[in-house]
Amino acid sequence: MPTLGVNIDHVATIRQARRTVEPDPIAAAVLAELGGADGITVHLREDRRHIQERDVRLLRQTVRTHLNLEMAATAEMVAIALELKPDYITLVPERREEITTEGGLDVNGQPERLQTVIDTLQQAGIPVSLFIDAEAKQIETAARLGAKFIELHTGRYAEAGSPQAQQRELETLAQGCARAIDLGVRVNAGHGLTYWNVRPVALLPGMEELNIGHTIVSRAVLVGMERAVREMKQAIQGTF
């Protein structure tokens, strides 16, 4: 079964709604790990709408599993990553007007720029993952650029309007996963996964890690972070 990376961005979203000090994402990360999280994921956005640079610095010192930093491929973010050296980086697309990340990174449209960023980070010992749609050309370009991982965007699967549409999207994810593995690229997945739709994605051959945030934080508001994480681990394993 794939491991679970818990995205704690929306703990910071609640905090930033009042520009106060609580809830504390660092405390949430500790509780998530106590609940069985295999990793902690945060997205340091250029507009700092939720996670702040201070959060990432503190998480780097306190996370005991591994820290996955999601970021845009900008000079500012590369400099921060080189200083803090998270366990790995996931490069994601970013638009200020979006509520959350919408769609995968277009690696075909910017190979030279991404090559520079990937080389810079990986030469510093930080493995790079690319958050992309499960499209053959995107996956092949990601492999050619030397990314160690891809993270397949599962939003279309999660938002499918019927069981038939969801099954088609699952098949697309399966094909993408298989193609990446054939090319020697390791595979993670995430976006829109919930307690009720995660199991089929978890069963895809070769899937290594699922990065899940909003549904866990939403449940944690009601039942607590440790229990919410334990129950997601159960959902991944098919025992929820």
From Swiss-Prot:
Which pathway does it serve?
Cofactor biosynthesis; pyridoxine 5'-phosphate biosynthesis; pyridoxine 5'-phosphate from D-erythrose 4-phosphate: step 5/5
Residues engaged in binding 3-amino-2-oxopropyl phosphate: 7, 18, 192, 213-214
Cross-referenced InterPro entries, in alphabetical order?
Answer: Aldolase_TIM, PyrdxlP_synth_PdxJ, Pyridoxine-5'_phos_synth
Q: What broad class of enzyme is this?
A: transferase
- GO terms of molecular function: pyridoxine 5'-phosphate synthase activity
Q: What are the site positions for Transition state stabilizer?
A: 151
**Residues annotated as binding 1-deoxy-D-xylulose 5-phosphate:** 9-10, 45, 50, 100
As recorded in UniProt, coiled-coil segments are none
Q: What EC number(s) does the entry state? A: 2.6.99.2
Annotated localization: Cytoplasm
The alphabetical list of record keywords is: Cytoplasm, Pyridoxine biosynthesis, Transferase
Its UniProt entry gives the catalysed reaction(s) as: 3-amino-2-oxopropyl phosphate + 1-deoxy-D-xylulose 5-phosphate = pyridoxine 5'-phosphate + phosphate + 2 H2O + H(+)
An example of a Gene Ontology BP annotation on this entry?
pyridoxine biosynthetic process
Recorded GO cellular component terms are:
cytosol
Q: Which cysteines link up through disulfide bonds?
A: none
Subunit organization? Homooctamer; tetramer of dimers.
Q: What NCBIfam families is this protein classified in? A: pdxJ, PRK05265.1-1, PRK05265.1-3, PRK05265.1-5
Q: What does this protein do?
A: Catalyzes the complicated ring closure reaction between the two acyclic compounds 1-deoxy-D-xylulose-5-phosphate (DXP) and 3-amino-2-oxopropyl phosphate (1-amino-acetone-3-phosphate or AAP) to form pyridoxine 5'-phosphate (PNP) and inorganic phosphate.
This chain's protein is named: Pyridoxine 5'-phosphate synthase
Q: Which organism is it from?
A: Cyanothece sp. (strain PCC 7425 / ATCC 29141)
Q: Which gene is annotated as encoding this protein in its UniProt record? A: pdxJ
